[in-house]
Amino acid sequence: MGAMLMCMLHTQAHSNVWKYVDENGVTHFTNQPPGKDAQLVIRSDTSALPVTPLIEPQGSPDAAAHRTVAIMHASPAYQAVQSSLTAASVSHGVDYELLKAVVAAESAFNPNAVSHKGAVGLMQLMPATARRYGVQSEPGSSISSKLTDPEINISAGTRYLADLLRLFGGKTELAVAAYNAGEGAVMRAGNRIPNYKETQAYVKKVMAVYRVLQIR
């Protein structure tokens, strides 16, 4: 299935590609819009870098994570932003492997990814969140357009993740949950992972990839 998707992404280079998560928390990519909750990850009018698919077919989450990491490390899209990820990791004190796992889950390393909610870029930042970290609009350049710049996106996203790690006492799973659902949702859940299917699947996915990256 992973090979079939890679073929689709290359042969559909000038078509839109959507990402969606089914009721079992499995991520899929398709060239047909599957519904309102789908996330557009490749636009037909952009020359986006190849994406790293986060497909989790039948099998354990750890097996899927190993597969994801292998594809990621061979991806030109990942290789293009390695230096930016390294710099942000050092500057803001966030584990480099955790950053990689979050970006893989958020955008599959597509800098032009845009969600139906308006989150943009590699780390899928909302413009309001990016504004908190110094990203400002300028004449002819909106915050959303600036967030397609990998360095700007990674810098702001890493600072946000660093703040979440501090807020939740270095508990990685809670910080990851807050990155997906918002810090308020984690606090309302009593500083636990909220009982949202999407968030719970997201945390499992990020942590599985993170564990694999830590031992490689």
Residue ranges of model-derived segments:
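Short, cationic interaction patches enriched in Lys/Arg with P/S/T/G and frequent prolines
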Residues: L5-A80
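Catalytic glycan-binding domains that act on GlcNAc-containing polysaccharides
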Residues: P61-R216
